[in-house]
Amino acid sequence: MSTLTPAMATMAVALSLFTSLTQAEPRPGQYNNDTAQQSIATYQEAMSYLLGRNGKVKSEEKAAELFQSLAEQNWSSAQQMLGYLYYEGKGVEKNALLAYKWLSLAVRNNPRTAEDIQSRRQQLLSQIPPDSRQQVDQWIAEWQPGS
């Protein structure tokens, strides 16, 4: 099983910044400019904790907490990173259901990421018991920002 390497994290940051500039996460007009800037700063802080850079002591737990707060606000880049953290068990307990949920929400909110995430989602789906698949599909269908 792969791990989140610094190169992967750097690539995710670049993709996330590009996404946020081209797609105005989470939705145009949903937040004012100050809120968007704060969310970008929070994302950058989460990446700093994840990698132990920019004066931050490495803390995957703190990174997961920050990504979680942004993911709940519907930021697809944070949903993607949180899904990866659940997939790898970095900063959170490894959990295929939650990894699949957050990666699926990231794809739903930013279809441009679908190709990058699809193989990992398929791997996760094979790990989820059939009786739990319906539950996770329902979570995804009913999920709303802030829930």
Question: Language-model features: where?
Answer:
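Short coil/turn and helix-start
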Residues: 53-58, 72, 90-94, 112, ...
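Bacterial N-terminal signal peptides that target proteins for export
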Residues: 1-9
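Mid-chain, structured segments of secreted extracytoplasmic proteins
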Residues: 65-109
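TPR/TPR-like (Sel1-like) alpha-helical repeat modules
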Residues: 93-113, 122, 137-145
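Bacterial N-terminal signal peptides
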Residues: 9-18
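Terminal, low-structured helical/coil segments at or just beyond the last alpha-helical repeat
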Residues: 27-34, 115-147
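Hydrophobic face of amphipathic alpha-helices that form TPR/SEL1-like repeat modules
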Residues: 41-51, 56-57, 66, 81-88, ...
